[in-house]
Amino acid sequence: LLSLARRNSAAALSACRRCGVRSLMLTAWGDNGAECSPFAVLPVIAQYSDACYGGFGEACAAPFAVWAGDLNSFFALELPNRLTEEPMWRQTNCSGKYFLYNDPLAGVFDSNVPENARAVARRNGEAIAAARGKVKKEYGYLFDTLASLCGVLELKTDFGVRAKEAYDRGDKPALAALAEECGEIVDLVKHTGLTY
């Protein structure tokens, strides 16, 4: 998550400065190399850049605004991985990823579905869409993709739970509605651009 990377980087930069380290290498890791745009970590790169010029990473918002847009808006990019209303320090997983790839009929992650996941995913998608207007247009695709992902997560995260409950009740109309929702989920996944 971006906020954790910035917090950890602040500690690393402080330690480097305190210990006299003058050269370091910053890396960005993406699962399978293509699951995350390298531009999603621009705020962390800006933090290191500010440190190179003698700052502590806090003064990078103004120069960042010139070439990328509002620095704080980039933190909306971590919202698909925040599907609960828990404080950020309690959320260090990539729930957006495992709910996207989860087979909702297998029930593997059903016990991990947050109670308000649908409402939180909807709000997150709206927040990401709003943040998009505060960044340079060349980075808009980051926000469009993740807002679309939130649309998928809104329907898919608790799909297995809802299907199991409807099945256990013998609620055929609810199951028929869920079958139709499957098509909507597939269409949303295609719209995200996250499939090959």
Which residue stretches match the model-derived regions?
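Substrate-binding groove of N-acetylhexosamine-processing glycoside hydrolases
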Residues: 1-196
